[in-house]
Amino acid sequence: VPDSALAPAIALPPPPLSLLEGAALFLDFDGTLTPLVHRPDAVSVDDILIDLLARLRDRLDGRLAIVSGRSIATLQELGFGDFQLAGTHGLEFAKSGEAIEGPARLPAIDAVESAFHAFADDRPGLLIERKSISVGLHFRGGQQWGEQADALAESLAKEHGLVVQRGKMMVELRPGGADKGSAVQVLMRLPEMMGGVPVFVGDDVTDEEGFVAASELGGAGILVGAPRPTAARFCLEQVAAVRHYLAQGAAQLG
């Protein structure tokens, strides 16, 4: 997202419950529905969250989707198999009972994964996250390596014709051609989502494209976390506030 699309880092108001009336709701996962964890494979999803999202989806006549940087396979393993899903930043799609739609894993991703492992071997605290069609390098546990990790990702992206996706304390290499904004556009064309007003909830810079797409389609973005330059119109301070807002919305819509 270009800087010109981002408003300054000011305190944004909380979203009104009326925003959910008639909404097509797009929810990021990590840092939005569940707190960020030191290791991405250490995250867990509780039944209370799944039940809340299912209830909210029913209140919205099916207009709810999870839009995540995680792969569809991982989202399904975490318990979201009954929901409309967009994974790997909009490169994959799936809904309950249907096969995953998305590109095959490129040989270049395997080459990048090997390079990431070689880089991490003598740099403690780094973690490689293998995804179905991409690979991430996390430096939350070794922040001193962040600049080197970013430089390596840029070099490998140029070498293999891939896209660098930056997130919180991580870099990821993946094929181009999609982001969370394009995911919103694709999902809004589905019969079960059409007619809704898009509302995108997310915490990371990777969610900015989702905020922009929602706004362009007449909706709004909700930033989760501290104020920063953003295309979102509203803000919720933390994951607990997101869950409270969604629970209130489900009750009101019921």
What are these regions, as identified by a protein language model?
Residues 88, 94-114, 165-195:
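Substrate-recognition "cap/lid" segment bordering the active-site pocket of phosphatases
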Residues 23-25, 63, 83, 198:
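The start of beta-strands in P-loop NTPase/AAA+ ATPase cores
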Residues 1-29, 33-37, 48, 188-189, ...:
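Non-catalytic pre-domain segments flanking phosphatase-related domains
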